[in-house]
């Protein structure tokens, strides 16, 4: 038998080194690709991949509410399984009001510690900062964070006072309702488009223990918003009939803005202001 028919130990070692190098390189590339695809935090509306729009949901925390139909969203891809709360830091909100002790126990800053219950709440998307029955935020919103500006799809809330213009009736009530409902809560956001102000128009949902809730529809049920009137740029994610159904129910019940004697829709209000 010739000497070339049997591999020498040096040849075997060289082959193993080459194989392990390819294996490690391939593993690194695969891990990096998977991280970018599933666990990379999006910190700007302009950075949202085009393949996410209308197809995928983003998971994260509401850190500030601006008006009755928009808020700031801190993206936490993967939730607890993605390292958030124990490896990657989630911003906490400063306490604003003082509640009775019983209410504090029920609505405290639930994710400030790493108890199993709190990690479970973060995993399924429950509120991390509490709500309470009164319509005011228990925590102050934080704006100077790497967040996405989100505009609720399919609805228009009464306009608050901006740039010296007067506010619409029930605009503060709509703002307080959204504050109470979303501030500090983990939500699922489905990007649909971007508007002229650079905001992400999105369908927003959250889990309320028993079922998923669409924030836009809940706003319509309260009578604190109307179905978006513009013929161009309106987004409903294929549910415009459902939106109009809940608006008509609130209108028949004279809830919120529908109980006002002389109600000017937000769309009509903005047209009037722009003409001045």
UniProtKB/Swiss-Prot annotation:
**Any one GO molecular function term:** metal ion binding
Gene3D superfamilies recorded: 2.40.50.90
Q: Which positions are annotated as binding Ca(2+)?
A: 156
| Classification via PROSITE patterns | TNASE_3
Q: Which PANTHER family match?
A: EBNA2 BINDING PROTEIN P100, SERINE_THREONINE-PROTEIN KINASE 31
Q: What is this protein called?
A: Probable endonuclease LCL3
* Residues at the active site: 151, 159, 199
Name any one Pfam family assigned in the record.
SNase
The record lists the organism as: Eremothecium gossypii (strain ATCC 10895 / CBS 109.51 / FGSC 9923 / NRRL Y-1056) (Yeast)
InterPro entries tied to this protein: SNase_OB-fold_sf, Staphylococal_nuclease_OB-fold
Q: What class of enzyme is it?
A: hydrolase
UniProt key word Acetylation: no
Q: What is its EC number?
A: 3.1.-.-
- Ranges for domain TNase-like come to 56-260
Q: Which gene encodes it?
A: LCL3
**Keyword set, alphabetical order:** Calcium, Endonuclease, Hydrolase, Membrane, Metal-binding, Mitochondrion, Nuclease, Transmembrane, Transmembrane helix
* Membrane topology reported for the UniProt record: Single-pass membrane protein
GO cellular component terms, A-Z: membrane; mitochondrion
Where do the TM regions start and end?
Answer: 10-32
């Amino acid at each position: 038998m010739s000497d070339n028919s049997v591999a020498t130990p040096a040849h075997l070692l060289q082959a193993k080194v080459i194989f392990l190098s390819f294996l490690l390189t391939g593993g690194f590339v695969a891990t990096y690709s998977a991280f970018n695809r599933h666990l990379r935090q999006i910190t700007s509306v302009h950075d949202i991949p085009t393949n996410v729009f209308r197809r995928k949901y983003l998971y994260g925390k509401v850190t500030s509410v601006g008006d009755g139909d928009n808020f700031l969203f801190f993206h936490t891809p993967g939730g607890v399984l993605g390292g958030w709360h124990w490896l990657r830091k989630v911003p906490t909100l400063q306490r604003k009001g003082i509640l009775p002790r019983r209410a504090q126990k029920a609505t405290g800053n639930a994710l400030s510690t790493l108890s199993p219950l709190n990690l479970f709440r973060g995993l399924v998307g429950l509120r991390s900062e509490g709500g309470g029955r009164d319509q005011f935020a228990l925590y102050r919103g934080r704006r100077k964070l790497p967040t996405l500006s989100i505009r609720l799809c399919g609805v228009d809330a009464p306009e608050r006072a901006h740039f010296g213009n007067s506010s619409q009736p029930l605009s503060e009530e709509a703002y307080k309702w959204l504050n109470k409902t979303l501030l500090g809560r983990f939500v699922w956001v489905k990007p649909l488009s971007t508007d002229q102000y650079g905001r992400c128009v999105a369908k927003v949902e959250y889990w309320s223990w028993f079922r998923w809730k669409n924030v836009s529809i809940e706003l319509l049920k309260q009578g604190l918003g109307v179905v978006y009137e513009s013929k161009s740029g309106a987004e409903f994610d294929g549910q415009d009939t459902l939106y109009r159904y809940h608006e008509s129910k609130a209108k028949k019940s004279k809830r919120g803005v529908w109980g006002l004697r002389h109600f000017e829709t937000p769309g009509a209000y903005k047209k009037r202001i722009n003409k001045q």
